[in-house]
Amino acid sequence: SDLSLDRTGRVDIAYMSQLVGCEPEKLIADLGNDIFRNPAAIKDDEPLSGYEEASEYLSGNVREKLKIAREYAKHIDSGFEKNVAALEKVIPKNLEASEISVRIGANWIDVEDYNRFLKEYAKADTSMFGHPVTRTKMGEYKIEGKYQDHSIAANQTYGTSRMSSYHIFENLLNQRDVVIRDRKEVDGKVYYEVNAKETQLAKEKARQMKEAFKSWVWEDIDRREKYVERYNELFNAIRGREYDGSH
């Protein structure tokens, strides 16, 4: 059957039922899984609003649609179980932790967890500042008190004498290059020259930190569940539109 779409691209049930000469309810039943009522498109003053072609409804952010359909089926109208069943069939397969790549600085990781990592991995002394990592409104990360910690952990084990673990972590959080320059002065002119040896040392600490973070994120079971769910909701929720050639 050819579906009549109104000017918004939605299925025009009122118009079609007049055309075929039957009750809207019967038409809706006859169309079966060719159409779905999208809760997000329902208008309160139009009892026949919100119907969409299957290819339209079962594409886009299907995770979000499934969440809404479940709510509607549970609290408003069990008829939405039809939506739930169809969406469950097309939802992208959940990615496991092992299939998700995570990098320091990703904004879907909570700031508290960056703090926790700094404390647990780099043995950061948080007694003075509590939570040194903050994220500004512009999305830039800052680490408070990064000059205060003179421990071996900060300046040797997880950092270097020229770039502490705090500085390295802050650079990684902001996707900045880890590079160390020496101040030089020639004929009263000041310039900065890359110190290759020190840069290499700091880059190696940065590499170790990145690797450690990748496994650290998934080590704790609650943290793993939280981020697997969040990642799938944010980045694995979209389904492309498939046109069914049958009508």
Residue ranges, per PLM feature:
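ASCE P-loop NTPase motor core, strongest for the SF2 helicase catalytic module
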Residues: 233-247
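Charged, low-complexity intrinsically disordered regions
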Residues: 1-230, 235
